[in-house]
UniProtKB/Swiss-Prot annotation:
The lineage of its organism: Archaea, Methanobacteriati, Methanobacteriota, Stenosarchaea group, Halobacteria. Its main location: membrane. GO terms for cellular component: plasma membrane. It is a multi-pass membrane protein. InterPro entries: DUF1328. Belongs to the UPF0391 family. The keyword Transmembrane helix applies. The keyword Transmembrane helix applies. Pfam families: DUF1328 (PF07043). Keywords: Cell membrane, Membrane, Transmembrane, Transmembrane helix. This is UPF0391 membrane protein rrnAC2507.
């Protein structure tokens, strides 16, 4: 979860600075990590 938060912050900073490619990539990776975290958390709670 830590890396997802770091990548979201990086995406916001890069977006403000005008680096659209880096911001988009960082946001996609962060979103993927958050989805993985939520799936694993759900599986853990169900077991």
């Amino acid at each position: 979860m830590y890396y997802a938060v770091v990548l979201v912050i990086l995406a916001v900073v890069a977006g403000i600075a005008g680096f659209r490619g880096i911001a988009g990539l960082s946001f996609r990776v962060a979103k993927f990590l958050i989805v993985i975290f939520l799936v694993l958390a759900l599986v853990t709670f169900l077991l």
